[in-house]
Each structure stands twice: as structure tokens, then as C-alpha cells.
A protein has these predicted regions:
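Short loop/turn microsegments at loop-to-beta-strand junctions
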Residues: 14, 280-282
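Radical SAM enzyme [4Fe-4S]-AdoMet core and its adjacent flexible, acidic
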Residues: 144-152, 159, 163-275, 279, ...
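Flexible mid-to-C-terminal extensions adjoining Fe-S/redox cofactors in radical SAM and related proteins
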Residues: 299-408
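Conserved alpha-helical substructure of the radical SAM core
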Residues: 1-118, 122-124
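Short Gly/Pro-enriched turn/cap motifs at secondary-structure boundaries
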Residues: 272-276, 283, 327-331
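Conserved AdoMet/S-adenosylmethionine-binding subsite of the radical SAM
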Residues: 57, 61, 79-198, 205-207
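Short, acidic, Ser/Thr-enriched surface-loop or helix-capping motifs
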Residues: 287
Length: 408
């Protein structure tokens, strides 16, 4: 390898897909379901015990920090039996070597039972639940394979998580259908007492492939936008409306990932989310068969780094190719971004969304740029105030009182 790989500048992080793209739902906008087409020649998309042990041993061994974070993702993670995750705990304990092990798992919530929740509680797992707000919004796109709505089952799952005291948060997709109702969306999460929410804008383009996939790779530039994609205007209005309620009522009580990362960038700290960081490439993904890709949103043949049976995680994640992938986030910014007053706040967002053109016709502008710019312009005075509070070692939540007094 051409560069020194230790000591590492940051912890090595690889998200794991124990069932690949296998899922009991068939959400219209899912970017991952079709990845099963990459593995048509493999009949069973499940991670073997041998591979699981190899991954856990190597993943822990490659860390230089005392805490190690494992992230289990899908597909639908709970389509592996509970015995699989009990084995995960056994192997983590076997190879921990004095380190603290943390686990988080993403699920659609429909398969949760008392038994699953007891396991998560006992082992302190953080559970992320995919839920797109109230029933009308959620069921528009999140249906099962028979075309039936999934909301009721998801809510039953959330009820079980709460009953067992499991720590959980929500991942909500903002699409063309629900983006016009930000407060309905937000009030729903407050009503179900969900204090940590990640709102993710869905942006996909259509490009049929010979193997059955139909979503465009980031390398393809002029493909048709999928109907379910949120528009830049919708995204900007959604964020501004949401922020106006949050900043007046909920700072320090409800945590919205994008608002947290925006404030972090405002004060010059790490945003804690790759989309808003200067560079990316630190979050790889490993498929059920050991294939490792640059990123969860870049699981395309052209972004495959190798396989854990042939190369180590360190070799792949610190390879020159992956370093270039991460650096390209910054290096490929068009002039309009480089000259933008809010570059520090978004850093061009996710490279997968950079298929628009600038006012000068230069390629590489983020499709959602107009929405983000509207948001940053709107929140600037509030972010400035919260930054001042943080730098004075006071609580950002003081902003709510300042607004009441008419200081802002």
C-alpha cells in the first residue's frame, strides 16, 4: 500500500448486510432492494457463520479506539433469526479484547416481537426504525410484497420497543408525497414520543440495466428523475417549516439529525454525518458474501473495493481508491459551490445527488442545492445565536427564551 495506515486518522467503519437486500417489504422508493440482482448466481443471500466470525474478528482488530460500533443493516435485518444475533454477541465478546462494543440495527419494525425487544434491551442495542410519519404518508410507498400497507405492524413494533425500554430512533424518508406536510410529520413523531429523528430526502434517477436493476449509478449524469423524488423547493420548505417549530419549542428535547449537523458545521465541529462532512468514504458497507463497497449508496459494480476473503478491511477501506473516493467529494465541487457562502454548512451534500448543473452550466451541482440554500439562509441568525451560546459554554436551548423575548 502506498500510504501509512496506522495510526488511523479515524475509526474504521463498515456497515454490515447480514441478509443483503432481502426484505419482507417492497417499498417503491427503496434503493437497495434491487441490489439482489448483483447476486443472482447466489441462491441464498445470508451471511455464513464463518464469514460472520471473520468479519467480527477483523473489524474489532482493525480499531484503534476503545469503543467499537457495529451497524447491522438491510434489506430487513430481522429476517435473520434471533440466534444469528445471539451468535454476534458471543463472537464480539470473544474478540473484544477489552474494548467496549456498541451495536445498532436498522429495521422496518414489522417483525419485532417481545423476544427481539428483550434481546435488544438486555444487550443495549440501539434500534433504528424506518417510518415515514402518519399512516397516510407511510403507507403511500411502504407496502409489503403483496401490496398491503405496513403502518399498523410498524406501530405495533414501536409499541413493543417502548414497552421493553429499548433505545430507538426514527429514520423517515421525505418524498414527493409527504414533503408538503412537515408539521403533520413532526407532530406525529412528537406524539409517539420519538426524540431522535433522521429525515432523509429521497432522490433517485431511473436507468434500466441489463441485469434487472433500474436505478441510475452516480456515474450516469442525464437520467430521468424518479417520480417519488422530493423536489429542491419541497425540501427547502419542509426544512424551514420544521425548523421554525423546533427552534421555538423543542431545542434540547427533540433531536433532528440535520439540525444538529448544521449547528456542528456552524461552530466548526465534525457534523457527525457523512453527507455534510468535507470528505466522505469513511463509511463502507459489506454485503452478505463479504463484498465491500465504498458506501451504502454506492453499491454498484464500479464501486466494489474487493472481498474480505481476499483483502483485509484495512486494505480496502484505506486503499488509495477509497481515499480518492472520499476526497472527490471536495475536489469535484463546481465553482458555484466553492464560492457559496454556505459551503461550510453542506459541503455539497452527498455526491450521489450531484447531477444538476450550475447557473453557468457546469456539472456537479447538488440537485437539492436550492432547497439547502433556502434552509441555510433562513436559519443563519438562529445558528449564529446557538453558536454564540455554545462557545460561551451555555445551552443552545437558551434560544427559545431569546425568541420569546423578541431578541431574534
Amino acid at each position: 500500500m502506498s500510504q501509512t495506515i496506522a495510526p488511523f486518522a479515524r475509526p474504521l467503519y463498515v456497515m454490515t448486510k447480514p441478509v443483503g437486500a432481502v426484505c419482507n417489504l417492497a417499498c417503491d422508493y427503496c434503493y437497495y432492494l434491487e441490489k439482489a440482482n448483483l447476486y443472482k448466481d447466489i441462491s441464498k443471500h445470508v451471511m455464513s457463520d464463518e464469514l460472520l466470525e471473520k468479519f467480527i474478528r477483523e473489524y474489532i482488530g482493525s480499531q484503534t479506539m476503545p469503543q467499537v460500533l457495529f451497524t447491522w443493516h438491510g434489506g430487513e435485518t430481522l429476517m435473520r433469526p434471533l440466534s444469528f444475533y445471539k451468535r454476534v454477541i458471543e463472537l464480539q465478546q470473544k474478540y473484544a479484547g477489552g474494548r467496549t462494543i456498541d451495536n445498532c440495527i436498522q429495521t422496518n419494525g414489522t417483525l419485532l416481537t417481545d423476544e427481539w425487544c428483550e434481546f435488544f434491551k438486555k444487550n443495549n442495542w440501539l434500534v433504528g426504525v424506518s417510518i415515514d410519519g402518519p399512516q397516510e404518508f407511510h403507507d403511500e410507498y411502504r407496502k409489503n410484497r403483496q401490496g398491503r400497507p405496513s403502518f399498523t405492524k410498524v406501530m405495533q413494533g414501536i409499541h413493543l420497543l417502548k414497552k421493553h425500554g429499548v433505545e430507538w430512533n426514527a429514520l423517515a424518508v421525505v418524498n414527493d408525497f409527504n414533503a408538503d406536510y412537515p408539521l403533520d410529520f413532526y407532530h406525529f413523531f412528537k406524539e409517539i414520543d420519538c426524540h431522535y429523528i433522521q429525515f432523509t430526502p429521497i432522490v433517485e434517477r431511473i436507468s434500466p440495466h441489463a441485469d434487472g436493476r433500474h436505478l441510475a449509478s452516480p456515474l450516469q449524469k442525464d437520467e430521468k428523475l424518479a417520480d417519488f423524488s422530493v423536489s429542491p423547493e419541497q425540501w427547502g420548505n419542509f426544512l424551514c417549516t420544521l425548523f421554525d417549530e423546533w427552534v421555538r419549542q423543542d431545542v434540547g428535547n427533540f433531536f433532528i439529525q440535520l439540525f444538529d449537523s448544521t449547528l456542528a458545521n456552524w461552530v466548526g465541529a465534525q457534523p457527525g454525518v457523512c453527507t455534510m462532512a468535507k470528505t466522505c468514504g469513511h463509511a463502507g458497507v459489506m454485503e452478505f458474501n463479504g463484498d465491500v463497497y465504498s458506501c451504502d449508496h454506492f453499491v454498484f459494480p464500479e464501486y466494489k473495493l474487493g472481498n474480505i476473503h481476499e483483502k483485509t478491511l484495512v486494505e480496502m477501506m484505506y486503499s488509495e481508491r477509497q481515499m480518492k473516493f472520499g476526497q472527490m467529494k471536495q475536489d469535484s465541487l463546481p465553482r458555484q459551490c466553492k464560492e457559496c457562502e454556505f459551503l461550510f454548512a453542506c459541503n455539497g451534500e452527498c455526491p450521489k445527488n450531484r447531477f444538476a448543473r450550475t447557473a453557468d452550466g457546469e456539472p456537479g451541482l447538488n440537485y437539492l442545492c436550492k432547497g439547502y440554500h433556502q434552509f441555510f439562509q433562513h436559519v443563519a441568525p438562529y445558528m449564529d445565536y446557538m453558536k454564540k451560546e455554545l462557545l460561551a459554554e451555555r445551552a443552545p436551548a437558551n434560544i427559545m427564551e431569546a425568541i420569546k423575548k423578541g431578541e431574534l
